[in-house]
Amino acid sequence: MLDDPILDDIGTIRRQFTAHETLDGRIDQAFEAMKQIGFEALIYDYTPVPYDLDGAIMIPSLLKLRNISDDMHDYWFNRGYFRIDPVQQVALRTSAPFFWNYDPNADTLINRFMNDDTAPVTRYLSERDMSTGVTVPVHMPRGDYATVTGIRFGRNKDFERHALRYIADFNLLAHVFHETAYSLFDTRAKSVGTIRLTERERECLRHSAEGYSAKEISRIIDRSVPTVVMHLNAATKKLGARNRTQAVVRATHYRLLEDRPTHNWPPYNL
């Protein structure tokens, strides 16, 4: 563990990540850098849309772990722990990095979200000596977000002081890391849940969202009216909607009607 900040300028940090051509390689690089400032495990997740239509936290499309048991995937995905995790509750409400401690007597930001409903999360982390850490929320321009979390095992009383000393370094590291990681995301990582609309279904729904009838859409895309209706009905069914209007609302909420960019956001030039 170093006594002095270890991070260089943004360009140097970015080059350390982009030297690796795979997502896992860049995650490994982030973990190595995190270990130098005192962290012992890494959690990295990305969620294309923060909330579902009922206001519940969405399960992320990507969850990557380093030095953490793989059973966390099962608990956070299949058992829904991600939805009730107090750390995620805070991450959705702030853009600043924060220290957390699952000890109910600790005065950290997650404390007000800890209750009987979140007890399974507290128990899981406590049983694995993962009760303290720092999380960096990364909120992106279109509403999607990621969190980069560093964990320290055990209950070292000095860890909070140490973590807060290096929290600015970790914040910079996490943001530059996510920028380079995001550029390697595939379609699955950027998609919400299991809903997959074809390009033609998206096109028809997009025109429907603009107020066009099936007959008008048929002229715009140069296809027959029955073909347009078929695509709209297929999209409505995939979205679990009762009618075309609800299908448009759901598709818009889950960002399924957005044009998919063929390029990545330009890097920061700082």
Specify the residue positions occupied by each region the protein language model found.
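Juxtadomain coupling helices with adjacent low-complexity linkers
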Residues: 1-16, 23, 146, 152-198
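Regulatory input/activation interfaces that engage signals or partners
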Residues: 31-139, 153
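Short hydrophobic/glycine-rich mini-motifs in sensory/regulatory modules
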Residues: 138-149
